[in-house]
Design a protein with these regions (language model features):
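Extended glycan-interaction surfaces of carbohydrate-active proteins
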Residues: 5, 11, 18-20, 26-73, ...
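Beta-strand-rich interaction surfaces with strong enrichment in secreted/lumenal proteins
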Residues: 1-3
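Aromatic- and glycine-enriched pocket-lining scaffold segments that form the walls
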Residues: 155, 199-238
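Inter-helical turn/loop segments and adjacent helix faces that build the functional surface
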Residues: 131-144, 213-232, 287, 351-354
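Aromatic-rich carbohydrate-recognition surfaces in CAZymes
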Residues: 76-78, 82-181, 185, 200-204, ...
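An alpha-helix initiation/capping motif
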Residues: 118, 147-150, 227, 231-242
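Conserved small-residue packing positions in alpha-helical repeats and bundles
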Residues: 208, 215, 274-277, 345
Length: 389
């Protein structure tokens, strides 16, 4: 169609599967514009995109894990993204709790009985810790969610889950034949690319963080005498603290091994060790933390996230391209993940304070260029591990 416009005129184009009366379209369009957020800064764009990931219905709100093919309401993705999409985006504690409450109701099976995401239920701890730091309502939050977290911890007791077992040394052993039981869960021809059966470094780091947090909260706000939870799990916490570092730390290599299977230590330098040093409760000594951060900085950090595998490893694949099989082989064998920058930057600020500010700015400023390119308001889940990414 064509139209002649004079200065000051406007035209509204409306598409519909049904014929509609054009009268009132201009008013509807104007009303729609008024409801839209003003996007003037990069932060405005990120906040707007955060809002797009919230799937709101009359009785619940869930998180879409990613456009265009990931599902809505996934356990790990919701737990990890929830503080950023709510608390740090708009400060909405009510929305945070609404989404979390829906997730807990939806995910009873994975949270308390069985899951192929062995560490995901334990990551609820980190989400609650962030909520406490943001709101300052420690007692109130523990009163509401404490039973849920304690139930999750209890579900890792011996004999409760098929996919993970707590050993006498307090550590969690994860194994199911031909099944990937961590976030590194790509498959090729029906077989996991990174199976990682045994003691996984990040799963046991999340385990220790959960135990320490729950025990401390129960000591503060639980029963003061004969607290069965504290009495049962304090010795386990101490066992994990005692055995974690000897199991995973290699002083001669300067990093924590990725997983251990019957005494064999996987030598791959991966970002999973980051969670052993960045969580509120760390199971390793300060000297180990410094060495681990140094190794991660030297081998994994890029301007688009942390690589999933060091380029020095012969299995490293630095470019995500080719067939679906080629891409699945590269997915956790070298691709850089932006989400891993957050815990890395967090631990670096803890160690170096404001002296790390310029470096943090350098590591994040590149994403603002991408916001105006590929995703239009968002950036990618992963990037090539090789420059220019």
């Amino acid at each position: 169609f064509t139209a002649e416009l004079k200065p000051g005129d406007s035209i509204v184009f409306s598409a519909s599967v049904n014929e509609v009366n054009p009268r009132g379209l201009k008013r509807k369009f104007t009303d729609c514009l008024k409801k839209m957020d003003k996007i003037e800064t990069y932060r405005d764009r990120l906040v707007h995109n955060a809002h797009l990931h919230k799937c709101v219905s009359p009785d619940s709100t869930r998180i879409n894990a990613g456009f265009s093919w990931l599902e809505t309401g996934l356990l790990r993705e919701t737990i990890v993204s929830l503080p950023g999409l709510t608390l740090y985006a708009n400060g909405d504690c009510e929305e945070f709790e609404k989404i979390l409450d829906t997730l807990i109701e939806d995910e009873q099976e994975r949270l308390f009985r069985r899951t192929t995401q062995c560490e995901a239920p334990l990551r609820l701890t980190e989400t609650l810790q962030q909520y406490i730091r943001f709101s300052g309502k420690e007692k109130q939050i523990w009163k509401k969610y404490g039973e849920t977290l304690k139930g999750i911890i209890e579900s890792y007791a011996p004999g409760r889950r098929k996919e993970v077992a707590m050993h006498p040394n307090g550590l969690l052993w994860t194994q199911m034949d031909n099944v990937a039981l961590s976030w590194m869960n790509a498959y090729v021809y029906g077989h996991p690319v990174t199976e990682r059966a045994g003691y996984q470094v990040e799963t046991n780091a999340f385990w220790y963080n959960a135990l320490c947090f729950a025990i401390d909260m129960e000591n503060k706000y639980g029963a003061k005498k004969n607290n069965a939870f504290v009495e049962r799990w304090t010795p386990v916490r101490d066992l994990v603290r005692q055995n974690f570092q000897p199991t995973f730390w290699r002083e001669d290599w300067g990093y924590l091994v990725d997983y251990v299977n019957n005494g064999w230590q996987d030598q791959a330098v991966r970002p999973n060790q980051l969670f052993a040093v960045c969580l509120e409760y760390s199971p390793v000594d300060d000297e180990v933390i410094s060495e681990v951060v140094m190794t991660i900085n030297d081998e994994l950090v890029t301007k688009r996230g942390l690589r999933s595998l060091s380029p020095r490893n012969e299995a490293y694949r630095g470019v995500y391209e080719g067939s679906q099989i080629d891409r699945d082989l590269a997915y956790h064998q070298g691709c850089a993940f932006p989400a891993l920058l957050a815990p890395y930057i967090d631990i670096c600020f803890k160690m170096m304070g404001d002296a790390f500010y310029k470096r943090a700015e350098y590591l994040t400023e590149g994403f603002f260029q991408d916001i105006s390119k590929h995703g239009v308001g968002a950036f990618s889940e992963l990037y090539d591990g090789d420059p220019p990414h």
